[in-house]
Amino acid sequence: MLVWLCGLCLVTLAGGRSAARLPLTEGRPTADFLPGDASLVEELLFGTGDTIELSCTTPGSSVSVVWFKDGISVDPPTWSHTGQKLLKIINVSYDDSGVYSCKARQSSEVLRNVTVRVTDSPSSGDDEDDDEESESANAPKFTRPEWMEKKLLAVPAANTVRFRCPAAGKPTPSITWLKNGKEFKGEHRIGGIKLRHQQWSLVMESVVPSDRGNYTCVVANKYGTIRETYTLDVLERTPHRPILQAGFRSNKTVVVGSDVEFHCKVYSDAQPHIQWLKHVEVNGSKFGPDGNPYVTVLKTAGVNTSDKELEIQFLRNVTFEDAGEYTCLAGNSIGYSHHSAWLTVLPPAEPVPDVDTSVSILAAAGCVAVVILVVIIIFTYKMKMPSKKTMNTATVHKVSKFPLKRQVSLESNSSMNSNTPLVRITRLSSSDGPMLANVSELELPADPKWELSRSRLTLGKPLGEGCFGQVVMADAVGIEKDKPNKATSVAVKMLKDDATDKDLSDLVSEMEMMKMIGKHKNIINLLGACTQDGPLYVLVEYASKGNLREYLRARRPPGMDYSFDTCKLPEEQLTFKDLVSCAYQVARGMEYLASQKCIHRDLAARNVLVTDDNVMKIADFGLARDVHNIDYYKKTTNGRLPVKWMAPEALFDRVYTHQSDVWSFGVLLWEIFTLGGSPYPGIPVEELFKLLKEGHRMDKPANCTHELYMIMRECWHAVPSQRPTFKQLVEDLDRVLTVTSTDEYLDLSVPFEQYSPACPDSHSSCSSGDDSVFAHDLPEEPCLPKHQQYNGVIRT
């Protein structure tokens, strides 16, 4: 039972356990515990199935009381009153959690407030076990209070909001979210909520004015409870017609009898009206006299239809009559939006007729005979090869064969062993030194799928070079197999005459890596190779607009603080949507590389190339990089190291994962929205190490929304596992791209000079910054100014 004795609150549970205890003061109760003072709210934690007894102390013994739960008078049959001053709750459950208060029946004065929280029942045990557990156990505490300093958050409608309460305790505490004092699970919120318990966060996408209020996180275990409250204010947006998420226009082709789903995600400040329509023909015509199409309504809003149900159109066991055009139509008081997709229904595949057994036996025997004949021919040919080779290379003093080992970033569970020889190269040279005196004397096995005759390749102007390799523009005839006479502009990677065996190994390794990765729109794809009768040429896609960093800098709007050429107008003015599109395309490319188990390790704007039609393509993902023998504090002869793009675990522990690539992607986002700015401008490398360890991060760029900056900060999470995946980044950026206006130009008053390096870039004669294709070390060391210049771009 529960009794009040001089300030002592002892709640007795079934079995005689004490759930919570308040301090006891000898003699008279202190002012904090006077019966008439309800300013103190006791918090009590119970397990499911317990029995709770709550008492209410009154000024006089004859005063009767009334009990309330969350402000509502309660008296269910499972509860009992003893003189109405003792409330007993039997076999408690989660629903019994809440704020209990008692009032004098003839008065509105609250005599007592008690918050009851019900969690999973702790395992029972003897007193000794409890004592041992209590020695190592502790109450919850917030682990990152600096993340919780901003208590008031004001955002425009349709943005994404995240509240975080990172905490720790033993046993691991639970977290519950309240909105305006009541438990909040988002059941009645359009779009719902995301509760990420591993990140101790509450996420609400596409917020609307009705989301305003106070949000409280309650973190508790059986040793204590802590809470923190945030205030959210949602600013009204300009009304607009419904916005339909990109991606619906995906035509479907299925076999008759299959099930089909069409999805239509709708964003609207005003309540939208959603309909699914199927286009039909009337008297052989698809359109009426007024020019509008004939349609039949498949699904529309109803009393018992939820928004989520309306966003999906199911077609069960489709027939040929179901084929045709389907449209999702969404409207509100401002206007209408619609997307359409086609459904094609195919007949089932005809079963293969049974073949006579004797015919099968004869066919099998014929195949075996052909295989045996081919083996004999190959064996005979191999036997004759040594004598021919000896005759052709009689003047060679030394023949050296070495296997090329993969040095690319593939995860250990890849289907290819990282030490598997990919290509065996015969080096024919009269020199015993380590240099290749004549690259043309190398012999590589031809790959028919990729081999291109040198006669069909016309080399053009140089595009860039490094210490050991160079890239030139060229015209290749016959790259497109279906157009054998068409010339295509390509970029050709090749070695210099003084390249070493390792340089050749790296270039061949990159070529083989690109073969294995496959093709994607947002990566630089392999087009072919010249491996016979001359030096090794690797043909890749040509990006006419150069790398993304210089592309953005060339398009900075002119202004009084423009630090480059104030007399030169930018080639074209970028909109905010253009920048989001750049980020989205790079995320798509990285999502594909991650799906192929490829870790880039040097993702930055300088390693993203831009084609003539503004397609972003990730480059240098197949490079061999020695990440274990680099001194990050020293400049090497191969250029500068990219410490400003590296995740802390890669920088300090040499650990490279997809999560470290996500960190680099966050820095690349910052580069995009500063139009090619240099990260951490004016921060010396030694100071940068210290700032990163202390949790400091770059501030929000001027032309970046709060939502996109939150994506950057998520990429820069100190714990790699709590950073978003590239798949999640693609989804987030797709949503941002969908709701972004196409005519939202950048703020011309922003001084982009603040994002420029504090000292000029200094390239060595062998800098790999321009030609990282042949770099053995990672390119680009941060610029080291003489004086620290923070420029207000570092924040905690």
From Swiss-Prot:
InterPro entries linked: FGF_rcpt_fam, Ig-like_dom, Ig-like_dom_sf, Ig-like_fold, Ig_I-set, Ig_sub, Ig_sub2, Kinase-like_dom_sf
Annotated control of activity: Present in an inactive conformation in the absence of bound ligand. Ligand binding leads to dimerization and activation by autophosphorylation on tyrosine residues.
UniProt domain Protein kinase: residue ranges: 457-746
Protein's UniProt keywords contain Glycoprotein: yes
Residue span of region Disordered: 117-142
Cytoplasmic side: 380-796
Catalytic activity: L-tyrosyl-[protein] + ATP = O-phospho-L-tyrosyl-[protein] + ADP + H(+)
PTM section of the record: Autophosphorylated. Binding of FGF family members together with heparan sulfate proteoglycan or heparin promotes receptor dimerization and autophosphorylation on tyrosine residues. Autophosphorylation occurs in trans between the two FGFR molecules present in the dimer.
Topology class, membrane: Single-pass type I membrane protein
SMART domains named among the record's database cross-references: IG, IGc2, TyrKc
Residues covered by the Ig-like C2-type domain: 21-119, 140-233, 239-344
Main location (coarse class): membrane
Binding locations of ATP: L463, G464, E465, G466, C467, F468, G469, Q470, V471, K493
Pfam families on file: I-set (PF07679), Ig_3 (PF13927), PK_Tyr_Ser-Thr (PF07714)
Modified residues (Phosphotyrosine): Y632, Y633, Y709, Y745
Signal peptide: 1-19
Cystine bridges: C56-C102, C165-C217, C264-C328
Cellular compartments per GO CC: plasma membrane; receptor complex
Active site feature: D602 (proton acceptor)
Segments traversing the membrane: 359-379
EC numbers on record: 2.7.10.1
Cytoplasm keyword on record: no
Swiss-Prot/TrEMBL GO biological process terms: apoptotic process; positive regulation of cell population proliferation; positive regulation of MAPK cascade
PANTHER family linked: FIBROBLAST GROWTH FACTOR RECEPTOR 3, TYROSINE-PROTEIN KINASE RECEPTOR
Domain remark text: The second and third Ig-like domains directly interact with fibroblast growth factors (FGF) and heparan sulfate proteoglycans.
Protein name: Fibroblast growth factor receptor 3
Organism (species): Pleurodeles waltl (Iberian ribbed newt)
